[in-house]
Amino acid sequence: MYKRQVIYKNKKNTLSFKNTYGAAKISLEGVEKINKKISDKVKAELLNYQKNKLESQLKTGDYKVTLFGAGSSGKTSIARSLLKNIVGQTSAKIGTTKQINSYKIRIPILKRNINIVDTPGLFEPSKLGEEREKATIIQASNSDLVLFVLDQDINKYENYLIKELLKLRKKIIIVLNKCDLRSRDENNLIKENIISITSARKNKISVVQTIAVPQKSPYTKSDALNLVPEVGSLFREIIETLDNNGEELLADNILFRSNKLGIKSKNFVQEQRYLMSNKVINKYMWITGGVILVNPLPAVDFLTTTSVNLQMIMELSKIYEIKLTKKDAKDLATSLLSALAKQGILKGGLAILSPALATSLTKIILSKSIQSVTAGWLIRIVGLSLIEYFKN
């Protein structure tokens, strides 16, 4: 088994850490600015609460280390051995943990405490098991360091999960547990296979062998009473990883979570702007329809010459915080109508305005009504197009 000679060697990349830490701070500041634009105070407060938690985590939070794997892989036993304390719930059928539990430990050489999170197992065949699995995957994605526990060779789904966690830039230590139930050659063969499967990844993945709960087997030489857990190599790997890269891993995790929160905040703002914009569009649809009903005018001429359309553009631009002059608004209206005409949208809308309708008084009234409705429809098309333009 490969062992590192220097456990607490300082290999920190200070420049990289500063860049990641700075990016995380900037991202959190950006979230705060976005939240100020949200008119719904309850939503804004909730998002600010989450933002403040991330800020606190970045400054003084613990390193979050999550145990992740199948229910029978021995995650809780590993946590128990690492903490030297009995934790978790027992179950004769599937796994030992039915809920997410966390345990804090202090290592003097580290800058922060370690928060070890023991999660429910994967692959539990039930609806409740599926819900637990989703919660477990979320916990892993929000961790600084993931201990991916296996008790046998890696399967396709586990390999898929490793790929997904690596896409999120997670640091993973693969823990090959229950090594006392296999020969040394079998363990080494499994380890080599895991390394070969994961070696194509850009991120380096460590593989550590453990015995969380020793069992009497043909491969153990000691008496059952003298068997002791072997998790020392895992403990050293965790400490070395956090000592060398813990600050960068934590900052990277906060950056990832802050970006997710920022997307959530932006979606709230976009939803709010869309509702406000629709009110503006509806207002000008009624104004346009009413004016044309009283004073018939070809719809295209109305859209390109009236100040009503330009005023709608100005109001929509304010909602999306885009500064436009009246000349900009007029140029934008002309350009947009030209683009819509090329796509045949105006032609299709105006096709219903038949001159033949104006041959009698009844048809004149009907003609005015159709012009009014059509102009309102065109205003809505223009308005929705402007929303997409300003949004992007």
Residue map of PLM features:
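Flexible beta-alpha connector loops of hexameric P-loop NTPases
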Residues: 122-129, 181
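Charge-biased C-terminal accessory regions appended to nucleic-acid-, cytoskeletal NTPase
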Residues: 360-392
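Transmembrane alpha-helical segments and their cytosolic interface motifs
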Residues: 65-71, 269-308, 337-345
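Hydrophobic alpha-helical transmembrane segments and adjacent short intramembrane/lumenal linkers
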Residues: 318-353
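Conserved G1/Walker A P-loop phosphate-binding module
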Residues: 4-121, 378, 384
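Active-site helix-to-loop segments that bind/position phosphate- or nucleotide-bearing substrates
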Residues: 246-276, 280
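Canonical P-loop GTPase G-domain recognition
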Residues: 180-250
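Conserved C-terminal guanine-recognition region of P-loop GTPase G domains, centered on the G4
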Residues: 107-110, 134-207
